[in-house]
């Protein structure tokens, strides 16, 4: 991945889980420990059926009083429905923010030049109030910037990044053994 390239991951969507019971709700249904997720740490997790069969995977990061779930956009409606089935009487709100936020991938080297970054998988910090994290699956995949669409191009300009074809990102991902599509 070239240092000044950015990949706009248009095939990724974002759910936002918020509410008094959001942490407990997620802890009871995902495959990873939600206690690992904080303002400075994100994790990769999945949702399984009650029989243990794979349904969806996602990257979870803390955002304000809730959690972002970064997942495949084509599955987002089904994931949202599934989460609402498990919701029952939990005090949680599940919002699809895919039309308001976008996920962009940038190189690990560029990420490490940003103030407050650390070379740890899943390390999470802020860039201009937006979440930026080193990919928790493999840090060679670079960092993910979860940013409001309105601020996207201004932030890319500030970081001196130019957009690149998404296929190059997926080629790297496949070489690292992380199949995304």
Task: Give the residues covered by each predicted segment.
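Basic, glycine/lysine-rich polyanion-binding surfaces/domains
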Residues: 1-181
């Amino acid at each position: 991945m070239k240092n000044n390239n950015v990949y706009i991951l248009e095939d990724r969507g974002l759910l936002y889980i918020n509410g008094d019971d959001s942490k407990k709700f997620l802890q009871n249904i995902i495959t990873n420990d939600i206690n690992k997720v904080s303002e400075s740490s994100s994790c990769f997790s999945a949702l399984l059926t009650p029989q243990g069969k794979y349904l969806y995977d996602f990257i979870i990061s803390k955002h304000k009083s809730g959690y972002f779930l970064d997942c495949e956009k084509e599955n987002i409606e089904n994931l949202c429905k599934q989460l609402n089935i498990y919701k029952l009487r939990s005090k949680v709100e599940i919002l699809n923010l895919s039309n308001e936020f976008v996920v962009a991938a940038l190189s690990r080297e560029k990420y490490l030049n940003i103030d407050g970054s650390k070379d740890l998988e899943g390390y999470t910090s802020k860039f201009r109030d937006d979440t930026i994290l080193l990919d928790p699956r493999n840090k060679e995949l670079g960092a993910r910037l979860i940013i409001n669409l309105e601020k996207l191009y201004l932030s890319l300009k500030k970081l001196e990044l130019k957009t690149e074809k998404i296929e190059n990102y997926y080629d790297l991902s496949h070489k690292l053994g992380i199949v995304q599509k």
